[in-house]
Amino acid sequence: GITRGDEVIVPTLTFIAAVNPLTRYVGAEPIFIGCDDSLCIDPDAVEAFCAGHCELRGGKLYNKTTGAHVKALEVVHVFGNLGDMERLTEIAQKYHLILIEDATEALGTRFTAGKFAGKFAGTVGDIGCYSFNGNKIITTGAGGAVVSNHPDWAEHAKHLSTQAKTD
């Protein structure tokens, strides 16, 4: 659902591989937001950006400066630390943002308290991504995994993983 010209909120502390699929390959523009003490994207800064620099029109969030549709929020869980998914989920719902989790560096990390207690990193948002590159927690040499609570998105990701063949 993210297309050329859309904007995506991303953290400043990340590796470019977490941003490239959204920007370089799809054509969206990144909006870099700072991180909190967890080293994950700061919910207060995300809320301040959405409330102060954007406006909701017709159920969509628009950047007042660029006029672009702000379509998604990407959370990158780093060094085993989890972003504040309770707050970030509320913000994503309030502003109608797709919530993407890059859980590569928190694979196996589980929420221990709150609304998401027992859930694993990457399973809270609309879509979760994991890399299995040679320098990651679990390696396969290359590749990764995508999980989603949207069956049609999961099916589309599966289609793309086979070089988008239709036979």
Regions found by a protein language model. Name each.
Residues E105-K119, V124-D167:
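Active-site region of PLP-dependent enzymes
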Residues I2-V78, L82-K94, I98-A106, R110:
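PLP-dependent aminotransferase-like
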